[in-house]
Amino acid sequence: VDFVHVSGTTEEKHFPTANGSGVAVLDYDGDGRMDLYFASNGYILPDAPGLGRNRLYRNLGDGRFEDVTDASGLGFAGFCHGIVVGDVDNDGDPDVFLCNYGPNAFYRNEGDGTFTDATGSAGLGDPGWSSGGAFLDADDDGDLDLYVANYGSWSYPQDDQFCGDREADLRFYCSPREVRTVPHLFYRNEGDGTFTECAAEIGLGRDPSHQGHGFGVVAADLNDDGRIDLYVANDMNANFLFLNDGDGTFTDATEASGAAYDDMGNDQSGMGVDAEDVDGDGLPELFVTNFAGEYNTLYQNLGRGFFFDQTPSFGLAADSVPWVGWGCGLVDLDNDGWPDAFVSNGHVDDNRPGSEHAEPPLLHHNVPVDDSPGAGRRFRLATRDVGPYFASPHVGRGVAFGDLDDDGALDIVVNHKDGPPAILLNQTPAASQNGWIRLALVGTRSNRDGIGARVEVEAGGRAIRRQRKGGTSMLSAHDPRMIVGLGPAREAEAVVVRWPSGAVSELVGVPSGSTIEVIEPEGDPDA
């Protein structure tokens, strides 16, 4: 993999060049191996060197990747921040949406290893400044809709102001507060290859409070009512929580949720985001990465759409205060059945006195508070024990997770600003010693990707709950297959998949190491 990210950063510090780009883990050609797609930015001024180019690499299955950008048609040349992946036409092939500074782009997968630019015909080419997004089936009609987080409105030279130290002739990136916010977008999939923007119509853009410097988006059932909700990390604005009403509309629960601000009522610099059950009560917590001087926030799920900032008690606050956090994940990296926390760090400024541009990443293992039965959970910093990458600083941005070598352990891919990426193969001894199963969900009545499905696994006396989510992290997309760690158990005694349609799939006695394609029953669940 010879990709090198280009941000377009110059001494003028044009704001869009600060945020970097993401990466996607996807099986673009249907051969069962996870491929890699990297996004790049570019220079903004007309006389500058030009725009970056996205690159697609095919997994050859022997630890090597082949650049297939030209042959695939995915060589987008533009200022790309985020990658959103989903099968929007339910044909079994992942399609790709790109969030850009400038017109967004949509590529339809033709099923033969090539993509067609279908931006215009699909109606997805909004000309603003988008950063991230998520596919989800908001109205449960069986196809994927699309939420797009817009960062704001910024253009050169109108918005190119000096921020920094004039006496020292040092120019820094301006605060996000200097960037005008704009409404975010929601596209309803019409089922015929076209989309209709309808954010205001369905409750996602009815008033100015629905504007924010949007970054990461996660689509998941956050209040345990069987409907897929939306949570959006905003940079120096309140984070949004929209609860699904079940009729294709949403209720804004931002202010009442407890997940909009930190525990002191301050908005933070929300960037990366994930949702996962870290304490074993069956409800997904929310995790948001933030700027230096703040901390990465863990909101404990109290049920019924209410959350509380419990970051210090979970052990995630102090370690994150010095760093600028970006892409992230609550992912089980040792297959013990408990999600760990990974964060990619890196400052925006490369010339600020007293501040380093490159910063070390963070990895926290999810561990019991003590040895007593039924003890609660907390996180323990583990970066000293997990490899040389964690011992050195990097200018990290987007992060994606996936099993690149099909050994049952989640690997990590980081897109670095103005540098080559990191591909971190998971060689954690516990990941191979613990049990695991891998589920590939195939919807029939529900969307084919199974986004919105809830999975319950019984193994070794534990009940493990996971969801097939949309979005997560920042600017990036993950392996669509679900790996569930079983800990010391050698089989999953029971696996239950609850589909968005209401259908239920049940499996019993699934041995560790199994990869199971779970196809949704086609009958009417209410019949």
Question: Where do the protein language model's features map onto the residues?
Answer:
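Beta-propeller fold detector
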Residues: 1, 66-70, 116-120, 196-201, ...
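Beta-propeller blade termini
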Residues: 20-30, 58, 80-90, 94, ...
